[in-house]
Amino acid sequence: MPEPAKSAPAPKKGSKKAVTKAQKKDGKKRKRSRKESYSIYVYKVLKQVHPDTGISSKAMGIMNSFVNDIFERIAGEASRLAHYNKRSTITSREIQTAVRLLLPGELAKHAVSEGTKAVTKYTSAK
């Protein structure tokens, strides 16, 4: 006896994927360009910290902008450090130093410890 067809799970709140196709006049389907964002990751972290709290799309836009800004600052500083030391590769050491230079006091300490933890987890999983 065949099993009843299962419906696709409802998309999670906060994950916005541009997979819808725009209809052209001549009947051809055209894929919409994907807009990359950190929204799904921000949402996952929010649920880890405050499981019963939601986030508005405006607040998500602000968070996405914040993550992009911090990413660019850290990448730029790490690039400068690599250039000063005549290195062509940005390693975790450059990233760590860039974080120490950019973030104030206790925030830098926490960021470095979380980053070290993430790198350790990644290398042990390989």
From Swiss-Prot:
Q: What is its main location?
A: nucleus
Q: One of this protein's GO BP terms?
A: negative regulation of tumor necrosis factor-mediated signaling pathway
Query: What GO CC terms are in its UniProt record?
Result: CENP-A containing nucleosome; cytosol; extracellular space; nucleoplasm; nucleosome; nucleus
N6,N6-dimethyllysine modification, residue list: 58
PTM sites of type N6-lactoyllysine = 6, 12, 16-17, 21, 24, 44, 86, 109, 117, 121
Q: Which residues carry this modification: PolyADP-ribosyl glutamic acid?
A: 36
Q: Which residues carry this modification: N6-crotonyllysine?
A: 6, 12-13, 16-17, 21, 24, 35
In this UniProt entry, the residues modified to ADP-ribosyl glutamic acid are: 3
**Modification sites for N6-(beta-hydroxybutyryl)lysine:** 6, 12, 17, 21, 35, 86, 117, 121
- At which residues is N6-methyllysine found? 47, 109
What kind of modification does the protein receive after translation? Monoubiquitination at Lys-35 (H2BK34Ub) by the MSL1/MSL2 dimer is required for histone H3 'Lys-4' (H3K4me) and 'Lys-79' (H3K79me) methylation and transcription activation at specific gene loci, such as HOXA9 and MEIS1 loci. Similarly, monoubiquitination at Lys-121 (H2BK120Ub) by the RNF20/40 complex gives a specific tag for epigenetic transcriptional activation and is also prerequisite for histone H3 'Lys-4' and 'Lys-79' methylation. It also functions cooperatively with the FACT dimer to stimulate elongation by RNA polymerase II. Phosphorylation at Ser-37 (H2BS36ph) by AMPK in response to stress promotes transcription. Phosphorylated on Ser-15 (H2BS14ph) by STK4/MST1 during apoptosis; which facilitates apoptotic chromatin condensation. Also phosphorylated on Ser-15 in response to DNA double strand breaks (DSBs), and in correlation with somatic hypermutation and immunoglobulin class-switch recombination.
Residues carrying N6-acetyllysine: 6, 12-13, 16-17, 21, 24, 86
Point out residues bearing the modification N6-succinyllysine.
Answer: 35, 117, 121
Q: Which residues carry this modification: Dimethylated arginine?
A: 80
Q: Where do the record's glycosylation annotations fall on this chain?
A: 113
Ranges for region Disordered? 1-35
Q: Transcription regulation: is it a keyword of this entry?
A: no
- Phosphoserine is carried by which residues? 15, 37
Which residues does this entry mark as bearing N-acetylproline?
Answer: 2
Give all N6-methylated lysine modified positions: 117
Q: Indicate where the modification N6-glutaryllysine is found in the sequence.
A: 17, 35, 44, 47, 109, 117, 121
Alphabetic keyword roster = Acetylation, ADP-ribosylation, Antibiotic, Antimicrobial, Chromosome, DNA-binding, Glycoprotein, Hydroxylation, Isopeptide bond, Methylation, Nucleosome core, Nucleus, Phosphoprotein, Ubl conjugation
Q: What is annotated about its quaternary structure and interactions?
A: The nucleosome is a histone octamer containing two molecules each of H2A, H2B, H3 and H4 assembled in one H3-H4 heterotetramer and two H2A-H2B heterodimers. The octamer wraps approximately 147 bp of DNA. Heterodimer H2BC11 and H2AZ1 interacts with VPS72 (via N-terminal domain).
Q: Which family does it belong to?
A: Belongs to the histone H2B family.
* Name listed for the protein in its UniProt record: Histone H2B type 1-J
Q: Which organism is it from?
A: Homo sapiens (Human)
- Point out the gene that encodes the protein: H2BC11
